[in-house]
Regions:
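Post-signal peptide N-terminal segment of mature Sec-exported envelope proteins
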Residues: 25-46
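Positively charged n-region of N-terminal signal peptides that target proteins for export
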Residues: 1-4
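Bacterial lipoprotein signal-peptidase II cleavage site
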Residues: 18-24
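C-terminal motif of bacterial Sec signal peptides marking the signal peptidase cleavage site
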Residues: 14-16
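Accessory beta->alpha helical hairpin/"wing" motif in late/C-terminal subdomains of nucleic-acid enzymes
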Residues: 68, 74-113, 119
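Short amphipathic alpha-helical interaction segments
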Residues: 53-74, 107-111, 136, 158-159
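Short beta-strand edge/turn micro-motifs at domain boundaries
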Residues: 131-136, 155-176
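Short, cysteine-centered beta-strand-loop-beta hairpins and adjacent loop/turn segments enriched
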Residues: 135-156
Length: 176
C-alpha cells in the first residue's frame, strides 16, 4: 500500500512539473518574441535628434524611460533638457558599442520567465483558461552593459513580477 501511495505521489509531482514547464514555454513564446528597448516612432534616424517633452515623466529625469536613463548614466548616450524640447544623442562610446539599432532602437535584452510562482486551476466551462503568476528577468543582455547603470530597469538585476492568462488549445497552452 505504501508503495502505491509513493508511486501515485511521485506521478502527481511529475505532472505538476510538466504543467509548470508548459506554462513557462507558453509565456516565453509571448514575452520573449521582442527585445526590451527604448524606441522612437522612426528608429532610422541620425543623431542628435529633438524629442518632444513628455507630458508626464515617470522617471523624474526628463527622459521618461529607465532604459534611456541607463544608457545616459553609462555614458553611451547624452540627453539634454531644453525649454520646449529635449535633445538625445549618442556618444563615441555608444557608437562603438552600436547601442542604436535602426529597427529596434536601444535594447537591453529580452524577457524570459525566471520562475512560475502559482496558477489557477482551469474552470468547468468550455474553454480551459488559467491565470499564471510568474517572475521574469532580462536575458541576452549585451556584454557592454553595466548592470549597475541600469538598476532601475525591471528584470535587469532582480526578477520582476508578472501575471498572464493562458488558454489550453489543441497545440498546448497559449498566451492571449
Amino acid at each position: 500500500m505504501k508503495k502505491i501511495l509513493l508511486v501515485a505521489g511521485a506521478a502527481l509531482a511529475l505532472a505538476g512539473c510538466g504543467e509548470k514547464g508548459d506554462f513557462e514555454k507558453a509565456i516565453n513564446a509571448k514575452i520573449g518574441q521582442t527585445r526590451y528597448c527604448f524606441s522612437l516612432d522612426n528608429n532610422n534616424t541620425s543623431f542628435p535628434i529633438r524629442l518632444a517633452k513628455p507630458r508626464l515623466d515617470s522617471t523624474g529625469t526628463g527622459t521618461n524611460s529607465v532604459i534611456l536613463d541607463g544608457f545616459v548614466e553609462q555614458g553611451l548616450m547624452v540627453f539634454e533638457q531644453g525649454y520646449d524640447s529635449n535633445v538625445l544623442g549618442i556618444t563615441d562610446e555608444g557608437i562603438k558599442a552600436k547601442v542604436w539599432s535602426t529597427t529596434d532602437g536601444a535594447c537591453v535584452g529580452r524577457r524570459a520567465v525566471d520562475e512560475i510562482k502559482e496558477w489557477t486551476e482551469p474552470g468547468n466551462g468550455n474553454q480551459k483558461v488559467v491565470r499564471v503568476t510568474y517572475t521574469w528577468k532580462l536575458v541576452d543582455v549585451p556584454g557592454w552593459i553595466d548592470k549597475k547603470a541600469f538598476a532601475s530597469v525591471k528584470g535587469m538585476n532582480e526578477p520582476a513580477d508578472a501575471a498572464m492568462n493562458l488558454v489550453k488549445t489543441s497545440n498546448g497552452w497559449k498566451a492571449n
